[in-house]
Regions:
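Serine-hydrolase catalytic machinery in alpha/beta-hydrolase-like enzymes
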Residues: 1-42, 143-162
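Active-site loop/turn elements of alpha/beta-hydrolase fold enzymes
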Residues: 3-8, 83, 132-134
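Active-site loop signature of alpha/beta-hydrolase-fold enzymes
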Residues: 8-11, 86, 138
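Primarily recognizes the serine-hydrolase "nucleophile elbow" in alpha/beta-hydrolase
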Residues: 22-94
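Short alpha-helix in the alpha/beta-hydrolase fold that links the catalytic acid
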Residues: 95, 109-119, 144
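Short beta-strand/loop motif that positions the catalytic acidic residue
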Residues: 99-101
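Acidic catalytic loop of the alpha/beta-hydrolase fold
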Residues: 104-108, 137-138
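C-terminal catalytic histidine-bearing segment of alpha/beta-hydrolase fold enzymes
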Residues: 126-189
Length: 189
């Protein structure tokens, strides 16, 4: 299921650049989607994952903090592509998480997520982070093309760079497939 948090709010266009909608405002959307999926006879409620990119990745992490932690009630696994982790430093979850970060991301710098993942792993939680050296924000999106693009209104007008990284994208896709197969297969821990 793909959740669209924007159309119901008037078709917001500049969420990431304009700070119009905070990631926490999307948490009820994800929890409502989870509740809906759990009612469907064609969905195994113990095998539901959550996935987000950038602003949606921040909402993903925030949702995990608000969702039930038991796999039979909440999300079994989560994938977060280039989230901004500064706003979730006190966050914890028992849900398995895969974070995919761009080493050269100047929009959502990887450092806070690397620190968070290390701290959570040290606490015994299943959090994996992979940083792709030289990769920018949006590294998995082929529509961005191989040349860097400056987004001048990002970060309150300071600007940020996006760029497709084919090697990083392919590796991240492989890791996502493996991660979801390991955590959503029937009988997985």
């Amino acid at each position: 299921m793909r959740v669209n948090s924007f159309t119901a709010r008037g078709g917001l266009k500049r969420v990431c650049g304009g700070g119009i909608l905070e990631p926490a405002a999307r948490v009820p959307d994800a929890l409502a989607a989870l509740a809906h999926l759990r009612t469907r006879p064609d969905v195994d409620p113990g095998r539901i994952a959550l996935m987000g990119w950038s602003h949606g990745a921040m909402a993903t992490l925030m949702t995990l903090g608000a969702a039930p932690e038991e796999p039979w009630l909440g999300f079994r696994a989560a994938v977060a592509y280039y989230p901004g982790c500064r706003s979730v430093q006190g966050w914890r979850t028992r849900t398995s998480v895969l974070m995919l970060l761009g080493g050269a991301d100047d929009w959502t710098a990887p450092g806070p997520c690397q620190y968070l993942a290390t701290r959570l792993r040290q606490a015994g939680l299943d959090v994996t982070q992979v940083t792709y050296p030289g990769a920018h924000h949006g590294f998995d999106n082929p529509l961005l093309g191989p040349s860097p693009h400056l987004i001048p209104d990002a970060l309150g007008g300071r600007g940020a760079t996006t760029q497709y990284d084919p090697a990083g994208a392919e590796d991240s896709f492989r890791r996502v497939r493996e991660f979801l197969a390991a955590h959503l297969t029937a009988g997985a821990p």
